[in-house]
Structure formats: C-alpha cells, structure tokens
Regions:
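Mid-to-C-terminal catalytic subdomains of enzymes
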Residues: 156-160, 166-221, 228-229
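ATP-dependent adenylation/nucleotidyltransferase module used to activate substrates
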Residues: 2-171, 233, 251-262, 266, ...
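Short secondary-structure capping/turn micro-motifs that flank functional sites
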Residues: 66, 94-96, 184-186, 226-227, ...
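Beta-strand/loop nucleic-acid-binding surfaces
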Residues: 62, 244-247
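Charged helix-capping and loop-helix junction motifs
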Residues: 201, 248-249
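A short interface-forming secondary-structure element
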Residues: 228-245
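Small/polar glycine-rich anion-binding or flexible loop at a beta-alpha turn
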Residues: 221-232, 268-273
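Short glycine/threonine-rich loop-to-helix capping motif typified by GTGT followed
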Residues: 193-200, 243, 275-278
Length: 278
C-alpha cells in the first residue's frame, strides 16, 4: 500500500504565502526605510521580507533594560551576516512596547524610537517601519491614539497576528540566528508599577544562565516577597523540558540562588490562562 502524506495546514500555508507576497511588494515602494529592529521574531521576519523585496533597510535597535541580551545578540548577528547598517542606541529608559502591559505613566514607545531616529541626521527623513502584529497595533491605538504619520505598519494592516509572525519566522528558519527568548521581559513581572532595572537584569541573566544549561526556552518570573523575605524566581519550562528540569532541579536552584534570588521554584504545571503570558 502506498503511503499518503496529508498536509494538515495546506490551506493556511497557501493563504499565508499569498499574503507574504503582498507584504514583500508593499515596502518595496519606499526604496529605503528604517526598521525598528529589536531581534524579536516579529522584527526578524519583517526584516527578511523587506530584504526579499529589494528594500534598502537600516536597522534601529534601542538597547534598553527590557530587551533581552539574547535578542540583542540575534539582531547583531543577523545584521552582521547580511551586511546591514545597524545603529544600536543605548538607553536606561525602559521601552514598554507591549501596549497591553504598560505601567502608569509609561511613555509612548514610538516617541522613544522617534527621538532615537531623530538623533541620526541621515535617517531623520526616512519612514520608520514598525514590525507589529494586528493585536499590537490595536492595543497601541487604544492606549495612545492615532498612528504617527511617518510610521509604516504594513504587517498589522494586512491582519498579521502574532501566530502568523511565529509561523513565518519558523517557516523561513530564522531561529538559526538564535532561539526566541519569550518576548518582552516586562511580562515576567506581575506588578509593573514596581519594576526596577536591576530586577529586569536579574531575570535576563537568569534566563541566559538556564539557556547555557540547555534550557533555552525557560522563562523566569520575578516575585518580590516583601519585607526581609527577598525575591522569588519562578521558573517555567516548556512541556518537553520539564522532565529534564526535574532531574536537574538542584543544579538549577544552586545556579539561581547564586544570582541574588532568595528563593527559587520550578513550575512544572501547565500555565493557566489567567497567568502572566510569556
């Protein structure tokens, strides 16, 4: 009997390819532009399609406390390999790009990006492409109002969801530049009004350490315990790494307690919908 291979996502893939072709053609009309390039999977996928369309792209990376070192390294590797001009602007101000998770008084993230671009005299007149999903654009509109006129949102305007970005990222094998690190680091905190720079750094370093131990998809959540009880690191592992994590829990505990965490717990349960999303 002949073996039959059933392609489960054939219809989705065909629709996706047609939309992807439109997304390649749309930015091409601008000739050259600046892309907000954080190294997140959305920005890597957007950069890939702009390059495919022959657009001359410049990468603007705002190196702020909420950008993980792994994503920054991925952005550098990508630009270096493809010979792209990248300017990394260092700032101690936190760039909260997720409009669904903003602390009171948080600045408009596009304002920070625009200020950084404005300091680059030869880039100031170029349009700024925002590699955001439809969900992110809707959240931005709800929080900050109309989109700035000098920005381009082709992916959101084509209805690209976060799921679509992830599909395109893996379809084009962009994880060869480094595994995704679970999105914005501010998602590792429950109370954003109390978030501090050194706490974000602790989380980022802990996730890097776990990646070096073989847990490259681990997420570390920060929980202040109050008083003299210090801070708790809650480690969440994907299903396929939980058994290995259980076997090495003592190594994990020792490693993270050496990073100023007072308590460490390994979360082996499947996250519920109301928990923090990574």
């Amino acid at each position: 009997m002949d073996t039959k291979i059933v392609v489960l996502n054939q219809g989705y893939d065909q629709t996706f390819q047609a939309r992807e072709q439109r997304l390649i053609e749309t930015p091409a009309g601008h000739g050259e532009l600046v892309i907000s390039f954080s190294g997140r999977l959305e920005s890597c996928y957007a950069m890939e399609l702009c390059r495919a369309g022959g657009v001359r792209v410049r990468a603007l990376t705002l190196d702020n406390p909420l950008l993980s070192r792994r994503e920054l390294a991925r952005a550098r590797r990508y630009c270096l390999h493809h010979g792209l001009e990248q300017r990394v602007i260092k700032t101690e101000e936190m760039l909260f790009c997720d409009a669904n998770q903003l602390p009171p008084g948080a600045r408009d993230p596009l304002q920070l990006l625009d200020e950084a671009r404005g300091r680059q005299a030869d880039w100031a007149a170029l349009p700024l492409l925002i590699p955001a999903s439809l969900e992110e654009m809707q959240a931005y509109l709800g929080r900050f109002g109309p989109l700035p006129g000098h920005t381009l949102w082709p992916f959101a305007e084509q209805g690209m969801s976060h799921r679509d970005f992830r599909y395109g990222f893996h379809r084009r094998e962009l994880d060869r530049w480094g595994k995704t690190s679970g999105g914005y680091l501010n998602r590792r905190f429950q109370d954003l009004s109390q978030i501090q720079g050194h706490q974000v750094q602790m989380i980022d370093m802990a996730e890097q350490l776990l990646a070096d131990m073989g847990f490259d998809e681990a997420q570390v959540f920060f929980h202040p315990l109050g008083g003299e009880h210090g801070a708790l690191a809650r480690i969440r592992l994907p299903a396929h790494q939980r058994a290995h994590g259980f076997d090495r829990q003592q190594d994990i505990y020792r490693a993270l307690k050496g990073m100023a965490f007072d308590h460490v717990t390994l979360d082996l349960a499947q996250p519920r919908r109301h928990e923090i999303k990574g």
